[in-house]
């Protein structure tokens, strides 16, 4: 399993569009129902800092997300609109969970 956390801060004017783009990615992931991808995004209290947390069963699952047209669009738009604070990526190790992360484990 691979766990990726990414945190960045957008400009205030772009934050709402970023949320729309994120929702488009989530809708596509929900439709595709990929069991090896568990992906969440939270918006911090400042209304412009986003924290992405992605759990991938395999590198192939991560590749599926990275090649998703809506995800590519999200990334392109985010880069084009600039950051107040650029993305910081961190690989995490799971210490514990209250529920199964992937559907087949339920």
Spans of model-derived segments:
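Short S/T/G/P-rich N-terminal loop/turn motif that feeds into the first structured element of a domain
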Residues: 1-69, 81-106
């Amino acid at each position: 399993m691979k766990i990726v956390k990414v945190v960045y801060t957008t400009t205030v004017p772009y934050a709402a569009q970023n949320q729309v783009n994120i929702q488009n990615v989530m809708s596509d992931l929900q439709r595709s129902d990929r069991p090896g991808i568990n992906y969440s995004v939270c918006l911090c209290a400042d209304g412009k800092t986003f924290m992405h947390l992605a759990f991938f069963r395999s590198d192939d699952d991560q590749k599926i997300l990275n090649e998703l047209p809506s995800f590519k669009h999200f990334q392109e738009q985010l880069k084009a609109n600039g950051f107040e604070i650029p993305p910081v990526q961190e690989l995490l190790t799971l210490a514990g969970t209250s529920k199964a992360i992937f559907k087949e484990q339920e």
